[in-house]
Amino acid sequence: MRRFRAAISTVLLLTSVFAAELKLKVVDPHSAAVAGARVAVLLENQTTPLKVLTTSSDGSISPTNLADGNYRVEVLAPGFAAYSANLKLPADANFTATLSLATVTETVVVSATRYPLPVNETGASVSTLESGELTNMQPVALNDSLRFLPGAVINTAGQRGGLASLFVRGGDSTYNKAFIDGVPVDEPGGTLNLGVVPLQSVDRLELLRGAQSTLYGSDAMTSVLQLYSRTGSSETPEILFGADGGNLWTAHGYGSVSGARGRFDYNVFADQFNTEGQNINDDYSNSLQGMNVGTRLSSFAFLRFRLRHSNSRTGVQGEWSFNGDPIYPPDEDQHARENDLLANLELTIAGPSQWQHHFSGYEYNHRTLNEDTVSDRGCDPTVFNFFDCYFNDTVHINRAGFNYQGDYTPRTWLQTTVGYEFEDENGYFNSIFVNSDPNGNFGQGFTHGLRLNQAVFLQQRLTRGRFSLIAGFRYVHNASFGDRVVPRVAASYVLQHGGQIFSGTRLRFAYAQGIKEPTFEESFGITGTFPALPNPNLKAEENRSYEAGLEQTFFAGRYALSAAYFNNQFRNQIEFTTDPITFEGFFLNLNRSFAQGAEVEFKGSISSHLQLDSAYNYTSTQILDAPGASSPNATGDPLLRRPKHSGSLLLNYFARGWGGNLGGSFVGRRPDSDFLGLGYDHAAGYALVNVGGWYNVHPRITLYANIENLLNRHYEEVVGYPALFLNFRAGLRFRLGGG
């Protein structure tokens, strides 16, 4: 027995002596560390990963128990091209992987599969805005940047801070699931105001089009939107601060402190924006504070905490100018407030073997108030004039949840993802609407809604030769609509690899289902002067979605042309109705509608400094069934605010010491309504052109300027709500410390 133990000890000793420790660091083209990259370590000429790890804040991994020999490392990091290299231990024990900027088809994205993967292998339609592009654009809020992405149509009711909605592939504005740092930030049922979401310290934005409920659950009916905060990476602390101002009494200031040292990284940031606006009661202000901190617990475990808080106030003019005709004066006293707080704690564990585990817990607190305290434009219920009556709408939503995701990679061409989600949706809301209240008291009577939802999901990826397949399903237990199974399958095939000019042709197809839970008001009713009864028996709204597309690259991947056809069948859509006998109102699953169309995108690198992304979208919609509804929402009518023709253009120039961008959003005539009986049944088409630029007057001082609505055109994204005319901002940005 003693001899056996001695032999085992000798073997272990020899193993430790001849085992090599690899220290690999992942950096970008400027030698800055890349955190969060997925690194697979394999034996040379093998497809089974020995280790699958995620880089820490300093861009490094340190896999242990690797014997001397020949290996291959494969690196996937969002925003970069996929990287692969051979190395030999112990000679390459300290190895640096320098990532390159991706060609138009090589960009690595996360949202399509919930883990890093080159976009051309996802079988999905994904568009991105990277940190440099966002810096060029200097958007005030999320809607200011999204409008320049392919397939996105933005409708903002008003100007800065106005209610801004996203329409994708003919779906409703509530058919989009939005996340900030992994936290869902829409209300249950999909409501989200994009116009008050600031983008300070956002490093990356991804828009995934198509039904995506298999991976993301309720509300992901036509798109998923993901925002990712910047992480600190420089060993020396970096202090970034700046300020800008412009016409309309606009003032903006911001700052951040970030860095990474040892096991820790950090990014603490703040932002304040104020403007008086273009007309009466058109002011907007928003303050933001946040942090993104992480620590490496061990060579295989990493913990990250994210916190973000914003508080906005918006003057609401209401409807007053219809296609350039100012029929009414703007409302002088209506205003809207929104206060949002999110927190997310995420633990990533590598192993054992080819597994990666992600555990996260989050909470999102969302409060809104929209009120009008003075009837300055007229209110007389005796003649059914409710144009400018007193009202007070209050919403308080809290979403808290726990998520688990496990990624198993037995081969480089095979990956399985499993997950579990639990969410507590809790909310209080009311809608008080009266014709007179001299004391300003709107009463109480809040409605309470509560849902406890659970889900499990499974996804399988297979890539063999020219063929790629991604298939999965989600089983949902929702407290409102019960149990559902939601499938998705996406396949792509490389028709030809091509040559120097035609460098690759890929066909793709996807079938998916999407679901959307009822809003709290629809399920639990509304209090107030015009109440709605609760309906606990509402079904989930559904989308049956097909898409098929072609992708063609040119000149060794420098340019890409893609075209996709989509077909959406929406059913069980929820509509408000009234009992003709009791005159009580409530919500029912009544409507069906249809949307089909095409998306064409051309993008490329015109030169090493100039990038182009252009798109054209055609969308045809129709209401198939709307019992009891009248125009403009009757059976046979097109869906409101969905243009048949729209397009976008984005040019970005990056050089040493200076850069700039040109953005264009082109939206055709679309059906709309004033809902006041004035006869306005459409919103006119428009072309919005923005420009921006920056120049380094010193290596650490940057001068920048941005102009919105360069052509100074009148336009209305929502009929009755004129947008801003030409407006500009200019400022200075300072950087202290850092790399």
Label the model's feature ranges.
Residues 108, 259, 263-264, 354-374, ...:
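Membrane-embedded beta-barrel scaffold of Gram-negative outer-membrane proteins
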Residues 307, 409-415, 421, 444-568, ...:
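Structural signature of Gram-negative outer-membrane beta-barrels, strongest in the C-terminal barrel
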Residues 416, 462-469, 566-569, 588-674, ...:
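Gram-negative outer-membrane beta-barrel transporters
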Residues 29-30, 40-42, 76-80, 90-135, ...:
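Short, acidic, small-residue-rich periplasmic hinge/interaction motif at the N-terminus
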Residues 256, 295-297, 509, 638-739:
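Conserved C-terminal beta-signal and adjacent last beta-strands/turns
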Residues 247-274, 279-315, 333-356, 410-416:
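Transmembrane beta-barrel wall of Gram-negative outer-membrane proteins
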Residues 126, 143-184, 203:
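Extracytoplasmic beta-strand/coil segments of soluble accessory domains associated
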Residues 183-209, 228:
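Short acidic/polar hinge/loop motifs at secondary-structure boundaries
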